[in-house]
């Protein structure tokens, strides 16, 4: 009998407390970058019933109305009714932002490679904003080269938000979570969806029967391809029986607490660093995007069925301390050749990544919900497949 395995990933909606915090942090980052593309930003947010605290470090020439950015972001998410216990116009906003530490700025603004040298490469100027390790991943399970469980989980909560905002399901409120369990065959190919869990906040008048029917027909069956659903697929819709109190009224939220949702749903490794609220000199963010860019182009080039790229940095140093490519035995060429090609084609110094992916632009608020990678609904530079031919040529050399 062939062995089959299950793998589960989850996602959360834009109205989830942690995602509210992520979106506020990235909205502040974008507002700063509009005026000052060279700003250094590390904006953290905490949300809870009736309050938002924004804190962290910013070095910039820009002036941003933090209060307005916070309220506009909350309103766009959909918290516009005081009945939700958290509303854009009535929430208390408490900013506490200070200038970046000069000790950190010293290493970021002048990397180890150029200190004391008169001749220098401009891309050596920026040192990594911290030490750390970052991962990027791609697999040929979906057209966007993402693991199927996280891809479906994101699409489910995105569909819920779409139906809520359009008014098609008027009783929906902003907070929601999804979880998808996919069955894989002995060749590691997804064959069916075993279980779908959706918990969605709702008005008190909505009945469980109505929610169950609408979610299955208008969300699950509209999102998950029919070939993955069968008579044995299990649907768990609001399994607690009631989800009226939600958002920051139900749970506090913090920036950076949904790092697995933000990436590959647990299918690939994670270096531990969060993304939102950080400018691109923070390699937690920019190098993770670069690693995804590399992995996606490797798989798209047909050089491997799956690829995981690890990058690692030392604070104040421009060049990565290590580059690793792992293809889990699926590569058509030696992994050492892939690593050599990666170093040859991709400039992995922080300034090189920023230039390669054009990361000084205000593009981050849109990434703060429904995943930073594998997006098909928005245009992100690290999802481009413009290095495929170069990689093919490099490994043949």
Swiss-Prot record:
Cofactor descriptive note: Binds 2 divalent ions per subunit. Binds 1 potassium ion per subunit.
Family membership: Belongs to the AdoMet synthase family.
Residues engaged in binding Mg(2+): 18
GO biological process: one-carbon metabolic process; S-adenosylmethionine biosynthetic process
A Gene Ontology cellular-component term: cytoplasm
Function in brief: Catalyzes the formation of S-adenosylmethionine (AdoMet) from methionine and ATP. The overall synthetic reaction is composed of two sequential steps, AdoMet formation and the subsequent tripolyphosphate hydrolysis which occurs prior to release of AdoMet from the enzyme.
Gene this protein is translated from: metK
Xref: SUPFAM superfamilies: S-adenosylmethionine synthetase (SSF55973)
Name recorded for this polypeptide: S-adenosylmethionine synthase
Annotated keywords: ATP-binding, Cytoplasm, Magnesium, Metal-binding, Nucleotide-binding, One-carbon metabolism, Potassium, Transferase
Gene Ontology molecular function: any one: ATP binding
Domain of life: Bacteria
Region named Flexible loop: 100-110
């Amino acid at each position: 009998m062939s062995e089959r395995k299950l793998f589960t990933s989850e996602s959360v909606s834009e109205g989830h407390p942690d995602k509210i915090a992520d979106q506020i942090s990235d909205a502040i980052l974008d507002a700063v970058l509009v005026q000052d593309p060279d700003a250094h930003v590390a904006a953290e947010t905490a949300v809870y019933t009736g309050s938002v605290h924004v804190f962290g470090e910013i070095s910039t020439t820009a002036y941003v109305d933090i209060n307005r950015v916070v309220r506009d972001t909350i309103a766009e998410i959909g918290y516009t009714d005081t009945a939700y216990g958290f509303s854009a116009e009535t929430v208390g906003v408490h900013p506490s932002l200070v200038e970046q530490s000069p000790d950190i700025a010293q290493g970021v603004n002048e990397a180890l490679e150029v200190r004391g040298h008169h001749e220098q490469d401009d891309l050596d100027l920026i040192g990594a904003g911290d030490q750390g390790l970052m991962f990027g991943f791609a697999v040929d399970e979906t057209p966007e080269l993402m693991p199927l469980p996280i891809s479906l989980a994101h699409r489910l909560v995105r569909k819920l938000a779409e139906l809520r905002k359009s008014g098609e399901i008027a009783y929906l409120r902003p907070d929601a979570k999804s979880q998808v369990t996919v069955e894989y065959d002995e060749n590691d190919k997804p064959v069916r969806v075993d279980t779908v869990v959706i918990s969605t906040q709702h008005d008190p008048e909505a009945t469980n029967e109505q929610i169950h029917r609408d979610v299955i027909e208008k969300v699950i069956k509209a999102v998950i391809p029919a070939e993955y659903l069968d008579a044995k697929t299990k649907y768990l819709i609001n399994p607690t029986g009631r989800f009226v109190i939600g958002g920051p009224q139900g749970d506090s939220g913090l920036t950076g607490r949904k790092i697995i949702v933000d990436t590959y749903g647990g299918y690939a490794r994670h270096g531990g660093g969060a993304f939102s609220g950080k400018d691109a000199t923070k390699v937690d963010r920019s190098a993770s995007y670069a690693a995804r860019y590399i992995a996606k182009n490797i798989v798209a080039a047909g050089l491997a069925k799956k690829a995981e790229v690890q990058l690692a940095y030392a604070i104040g140093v421009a060049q990565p301390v290590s580059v690793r490519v792992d293809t889990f035995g699926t590569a058509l060429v030696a992994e050492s050749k892939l690593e050599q090609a990666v170093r040859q084609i991709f400039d992995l110094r922080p300034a090189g990544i920023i230039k390669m992916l054009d990361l000084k632009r205000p593009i981050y608020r849109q990434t703060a919900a429904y995943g930073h990678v594998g997006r098909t609904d928005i245009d992100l530079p690290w999802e481009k497949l413009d290095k495929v031919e170069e990689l093919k040529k490099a490994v043949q050399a």
